[in-house]
Amino acid sequence: MKAVVIGGGVFGSLIARELTKYDLEVTLIERNLGVGWGVTKANSAVVHAGYDDPPESVRAQFCASGNAMYEDLSKELDFDFKRIGSFVVAFNDEELKELERLLKQGEENGVPGLTILERDEVLSMEPNLNPEVKYALYAPTAGITEPWMVAIAAVENAVQNGLKLVLGESVVGFEKVNGRVKKVHTSKGEYEADIVINCAGLHADEIAKLAGAEYVPLHPRKGEYILLDKKLQGLVKRVIFPTPTKVSKGILVLPTVDGGILLGPTAEDLPEEMKDRPITTREGLEKVREFTKKLVPSLDFSLVVKTFSGLRPESPQKDFFIKVSETVKNFVNVMATRSPGLTAAPAVAKYVVEELIQEKMRIPLEKKKDFKPERKRIVHYSELPLEEWRREIERDPRAGRLVCFCNEVTEKEIVEAIRRGARTLDGVKFRTRAMFGRCQGGFCMARILKILERELGVDMSEIKMKSENSWVVNGKVRK
C-alpha cells in the first residue's frame, strides 16, 4: 500500500509522520527545496487556545484538541513550544461585550481556564500594556512555537521511520483508473499511489482540479510583520491580541520562542495570481506600527531586525475543507487551512489517518511495531553550560567555531544541518537560526556558503538561497 502526501507544510509533514506509524510506503512531495517554506514559514507562530472559532465550524473541531497535543508533540520531536497564555484586550465596555462573547464561545469549544480580568490585574501581569486598557480575556493554554521547525522535526522523524522525501518537484498531473489515482506525475518523475493526501497550501485548489476532485477556491490573504530585536525580551510575556474584527484576530504583539518581539499581521485579501508574492509595503508596515503602539506604547522601532509578509489560504466559507473526495475515491483534501491551521494540524493529522482513511475510505492499516516516535534537535552549543561546551569543543573543535555571531551558531551545527538534508542557505537558516539575527546574514552568509560548498562537494555557484532559481553567486572573480 502506497500513500503520497502533496505539500510539505505543517499539515503535510505531520500527516506524513502519522502515516509512517503504519505499514505503508509513504512519499512526501514538496515543490520547494525544503519543508515548511510556504504558508507555514511566515505566520504568527501562535498555538491558539480555541475561543475564536464558531462552535459549529470545522476549525473549532480541531483547534482546542490540536492545542492540547502540542505539549507531548514538542517533547517527542524536540522543538520549542512555550505555553505562555494570551490576552485579548479591551479598552471600553463595547469591546468587553466581545470578550464576553469569546469567553462563552471558548467554553462551548472546551477551552479550559478562560477568564476575564480587570485593569489592575491585567497591568500587574503585563505592565507594559497601554494603561488605558480596561479588561482582558485571559487564555492560559495559548502558546508559541516555530512553525517551520514543527514541519522540519516531523519530516526528520518520518524519514527515520521510512518516509521517502521528494524535494524540488511540482505535481503536474495524475493518472487515474476507474475513478482512483494510480500515479502522481511531477515535473521530474512519477509516483505510484493507493492513497493521495492533498496538503498543497495555497495551491491545494489547483492540485484538486488537476485530480478532478472537489475543491474550494483559494486566494491569498497577506499578513505583514515586523520582528524586533532580542534586546526587548520581556517587554511582553504573553500573546497580546486586540479585540478581534470580522476580518481577522487583529494585529498582535507577542514574544518569539528565542526572545524577540513579533508584531503583526495585517490582513489584506489579494487576487489569486498573487499566491506566490509575499511582498511588504510601506502602508502595511505603517499599519503594524500604528496598531501595535496602541497595545504597547513603549515599542522601540529603532530595534527592527526584519520585516516580512506571509500568505495564508482564504476561502469563501472561511473554514477548513478536510474531506475524502466523492469523485476521486482515494483522494483526500486538506485545504483552506487558514488560522488556526498551525494549532489544528496535529489533531487534523490523526483525523485524516484514523477517521478518513481507515473509517471513511475503509482502508485497514496495520501499525508498525518498530515506529520510533522521537527525534532530537540539533544541539545549540552556546546554550550548554560552559564546562559541557568546553568538553564538546575538545571532542570536536567545530563546536567552538562561531559562524553566526548574532545567534551564536557554530560550524558544527551548520554541518549537522547539512547532514540532515540542508542543501540551501535557507535550509541551514531554518534548522539553526543562522542568518536570523540582526545582520540577517550580512556577516555569516559567505562563511555558510563556503561550508555548504565544502560539505556538499559542489561549486559555490551551484548553491541556492531557497528555490531552484535563487542563485547567490554567479562565479568567482579570481580563479
Explain the meaning of each model-derived region.
Residues A45-M125, G250-I251:
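Dinucleotide-binding Rossmann-like beta1-alpha1 core, especially the glycine-rich loop
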Residues L137-I195:
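Helical element adjacent to the flavin cofactor pocket in flavoenzyme catalytic cores
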Residues M1-L28:
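N-terminal Rossmann-like FAD-binding beta1-loop-alpha1 element of flavoenzymes
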Residues A153, S248, V257-D258, E273-L402, ...:
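C-terminal catalytic lobe of FAD-dependent flavoproteins
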Residues P54, Q61-A64, V89-E98, L137-E156, ...:
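Short beta-strand to alpha-helix junction loop
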